[in-house]
């Protein structure tokens, strides 16, 4: 629903009447096909199917490992808050139970009592987790947003965006 600069600002969902029923296919033909190609290479297709076939196993391990870590952190004296759907109460827990069937995901956020310095020290002391900004890998990943992805913001701006000084985010892998 946004103007496409590569087609002179065309908005595919607002095409004239004779083309309205074709909006999706025109968008697919003009941009998606151009950007991704008509078909996967055989090797890419092989990798895709290998990943798809093992997805349920990997997701189950992500969820189990993240749940174990969240429960451990929830009882740790240096952690003031854990953000994980499986530990929430009230409406949030009900939503998680309704929508996250089979597990609560692989992301765990937590606040360290020592603030920004504790967050940096925690990240620097990790041996198993990779210190990167992305999430959803088979490997365990960790980041301290206050000193990395949000470091250009003032402390007030960080807090307004939901990033507190001691907040650490883990993307729990399948190790």
Model-derived features: where do they sit?
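Active-site C-terminal subdomain of aminotransferase-like
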Residues: 1-107, 111-139
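PLP-dependent enzyme catalytic core of the Aspartate aminotransferase-like
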Residues: 58, 124-125, 134, 140-175
């Amino acid at each position: 629903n946004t103007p496409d600069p590569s087609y002179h600002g065309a908005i595919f969902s607002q095409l004239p009447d004779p083309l309205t029923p074709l909006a999706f296919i025109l968008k697919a033909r003009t941009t998606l096909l151009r950007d991704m190609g008509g078909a996967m290479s055989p090797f890419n297709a092989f990798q895709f199917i290998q990943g798809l076939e093992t997805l349920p196993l990997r997701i189950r391990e992500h969820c189990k490992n993240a749940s174990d870590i969240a429960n451990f952190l929830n009882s740790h004296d240096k952690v003031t808050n854990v953000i994980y759907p499986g530990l929430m109460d009230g409406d949030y827990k009900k939503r998680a139970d309704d929508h996250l069937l089979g597990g609560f995901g692989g992301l765990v956020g937590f606040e360290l009592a020592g603030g920004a310095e504790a967050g940096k020290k925690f990240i620097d002391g990790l041996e198993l987790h990779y210190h990167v900004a992305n999430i959803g890998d088979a490997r365990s990943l960790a980041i301290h947003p206050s000193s990395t992805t949000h470091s250009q913001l003032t402390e007030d701006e960080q807090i307004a965006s939901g990033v507190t000084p001691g907040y650490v985010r883990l993307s729990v892998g399948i190790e």
